């Protein structure tokens, strides 16, 4: 029996493992193994909702082991550290517990076909101080860290206001501005914009849960973008509409502003200016992990992505595929396939078909990315975007309730790929029930 190993359980990796398990694993044509450093899967485009407490990671995450049991693939927890192409195995680092004790030793996982789907991480562009003084939103662990710090900040702010009321200012805790909670977000892409909107919405809800007289006026978000406009993937008119919406919420948007250094509670701009904040998030650009440099001579580009052919096979080794954000595939227009969830979803389907073809001794097919458009959610305020128009050259502009429905449907499509029609219907029902049974925000 052949071994098919998928490294990375993100949007593309877990969908691919599900497709392969349901066919090759079920029919015992291959042993399908999924490898990930975490025990659970969470759809990365929704990490900003985990960060603000809108989404509960405990409810919305998916156990790899449980999902594998239901879809005929096995799961190995661990981080890949290298590939041996000659002997055809991947080496995984040991797994350690919270107390630092080793739970699982280093292992070698043999493969006949290997798929790398390790995604991407925030690109700090080697900016001084960013790693030490900023929070990234690349994982649920980082999103939860942000959420805990956010709740602590609002608790401090609420307590300071209460001390003002009773005249005991000497006990107040220090914030960069005693009149507001200040948060700086670097990066005017989808993550930065959506996080900004969710923060203002969360601030409005906190007063309902015992945080005192807090509303969105108590929050100041500074959104910093090095380019000339927000959301460059959107048409200019929609980018301008997003800018207007954020400003109406109270956001301080700084365009054409490059950050050269991050210090504790301070960002330094290229012109020498300072941006003070109680909490700083870095969401500017992405790159693949440097671990790809240890992949036994596979071709990588300047941001560590694995260069692949149109069949999604790596240029050096036909038995190794790469999909999602970690794959560099040049399209016919000369541009790389963008690092988006919809690209990972399409690549997972195409890769599964090509692996099926290998088992059936059939020719592999070329992958062609179909850009279906871009959607951005501004929390409960609105949503907008542009969708590909099959009947004309100009994209369709969508806004409001239809755009919100389309945005939510992207996540439902991912869930459908994992669970099928019946289970996704039950999941939607449970989600609706949870709106009535649970608080709007996760407060712990």
From Swiss-Prot:
It is found in: Cell inner membrane. Pfam families: Pyr_redox_2. InterPro entries: FAD/NAD-bd_sf, FAD/NAD-binding_dom, NADH-Q_oxidoreductase. SUPFAM superfamilies: FAD/NAD(P)-binding domain (SSF51905). Its cofactor is FAD. Its EC number is 1.6.5.9. One of its GO terms (molecular function) is NADH dehydrogenase (ubiquinone) activity. Binds 1 FAD per subunit. FAD binds at residues 8-12, 38, 120, 325, 341. Its main location: membrane. It catalyses: a quinone + NADH + H(+) = a quinol + NAD(+); a ubiquinone + NADH + H(+) = a ubiquinol + NAD(+). Signal peptide: none annotated. Alternative, nonproton pumping NADH:quinone oxidoreductase that delivers electrons to the respiratory chain by oxidation of NADH and reduction of quinones. Utilizes NADH exclusively, and electron flow from NADH to ubiquinone does not generate an electrochemical gradient. Belongs to the NADH dehydrogenase family. This is Type II NADH:quinone oxidoreductase. The lineage of its organism: Bacteria, Pseudomonadati, Pseudomonadota, Gammaproteobacteria, Pasteurellales. The gene is ndh.
